[in-house]
């Protein structure tokens, strides 16, 4: 998570070049690279921009994740304590030391801030009550989010198999009609949210990876089959496969950060998900929103587990409330687009679901278990939360911190 990565390799499942850098089979074709082994193109993703973004947004996880924040090694040993009494760790790989969090000290002000967010108190009342200006509120929210992430990172329960659902959604910011792009991954058995990522970077990356579109890709009315096929058609029309248009997104001129293309947070997001869960489980099933770069991020983070058959990935679309036992007629259809994947659609009077098992079992009974229920549940929780009007008036940085705390509130109510 803290070491640099390069993801410019073939992402075709079953291809011998999957995950292989600089293969002799690769031929550059403009912004893409052709893999002559499988015949598919994959877009070039800037190694510099991806690692800049990862290093910036992962900074708040230093000491929370048991990895060296300098080189990413897990070969560590205890190395005494700091002057403040915090555990110090030594990295065998790079000979650096760092502070490992064993507890986080909160403050009465931060405790009161957390309570006011939970109750949906307005931003003006929070600032007046806690005597916070814009800078002070930003600092307190960052600390509150770090405290929440620390607590959540130690709450996982071991399980032989887990299913994780991932969805994308949008939240307004700065009191405008601009949107932040957000990914959320939740564990299906318990409903707990594992991780949240946004496309806001506190510092700028390469200009080419700044999100600049004001257009929104929209789905016309229709069945899930039509939506799947329409999504593939929209993806094919993009200048680059990962150049999604999710709506307008402009920052204030005095904001030092950047809204990056969603491909960067997608690749970082699944790294975080895997690090937070891999110690507690053996086999993982990922259910994903239908989006090519979300699949790419999941593939990169779980490459070794996919090769060993311990990780499986499916695209899922659903509408309505899933019944306890899905007894529905199913039919196969092709998605069209670049890959023309085979999907299976299930439908009842009140519920419909379409699934594409990219790896793993193709049995109908196994495919019936596919769902995005837990990720959708958290999105609905955010959209109904009394603090949402205040979130919509915050800066993107504060929105990201507040969502991390809402994740903690959501998980706490499930305990």
Spans of features found by a protein language model:
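A short acidic (Asp/Glu
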Residues: 138-140, 292-302
């Amino acid at each position: 998570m803290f070491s640099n990565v390069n993801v410019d390799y073939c992402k075709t499942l079953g291809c011998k070049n999957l995950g292989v850098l600089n293969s002799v089979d690769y031929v550059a074709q403009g912004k893409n690279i052709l893999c002559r082994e499988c015949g598919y193109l994959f877009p070039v993703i800037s190694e510099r921009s991806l690692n800049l973004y990862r290093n910036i947004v992962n900074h708040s996880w230093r000491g929370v994740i048991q990895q060296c924040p300098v080189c990413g090694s897990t070969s560590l040993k205890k190395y005494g304590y700091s002057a403040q009494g915090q555990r110090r760790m030594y990295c065998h790989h790079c000979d650096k030391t760092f502070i490992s969090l064993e507890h986080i000290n909160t403050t009465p002000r931060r405790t009161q801030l957390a309570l006011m967010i939970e109750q949906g108190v307005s931003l003006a009342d929070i600032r007046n009550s806690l005597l916070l200006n814009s800078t002070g509120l930003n600092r307190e929210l960052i600390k509150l989010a770090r405290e929440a992430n620390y607590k959540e990172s130690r709450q996982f329960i071991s399980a032989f198999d887990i299913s994780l659902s991932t969805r994308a959604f949008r939240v307004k910011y700065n009191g405008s009609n601009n949107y932040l792009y957000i990914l959320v991954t939740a564990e299906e058995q318990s409903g707990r949210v594992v991780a949240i990522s946004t496309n806001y970077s506190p510092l700028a990356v390469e200009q080419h990876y700044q999100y600049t579109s004001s257009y929104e890709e929209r789905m016309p009315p229709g069945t899930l089959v039509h939506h799947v096929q329409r999504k593939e058609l929209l993806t094919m029309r993009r200048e680059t496969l990962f150049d999604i248009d999710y709506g307008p997104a402009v920052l204030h001129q005095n904001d030092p950060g950047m809204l990056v293309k969603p491909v960067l947070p997608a690749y970082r997001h699944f790294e975080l998900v895997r690090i937070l869960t891999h110690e507690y489980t053996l086999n993982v099933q990922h259910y994903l929103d239908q989006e090519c770069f979300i699949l790419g991020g999941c593939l990169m983070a779980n490459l070794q587990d996919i090769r060993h058959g311990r990780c499986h990935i499916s695209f899922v679309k659903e509408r309505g409330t899933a019944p306890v036992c899905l007894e529905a007629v199913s039919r196969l259809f092709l998605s069209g687009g670049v890959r023309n994947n085979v999907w299976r659609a299930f439908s009842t009077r009140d519920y419909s679901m379409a699934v594409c098992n990219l790896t793993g079992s193709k049995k109908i009974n196994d495919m019936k278990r596919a769902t995005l229920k837990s990720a959708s549940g958290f999105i609905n929780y955010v959209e109904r939360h009394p603090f949402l009007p205040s979130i919509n008036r915050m800066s993107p940085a504060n929105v990201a911190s507040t969502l991390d705390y809402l994740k903690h509130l959501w998980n706490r109510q499930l305990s």
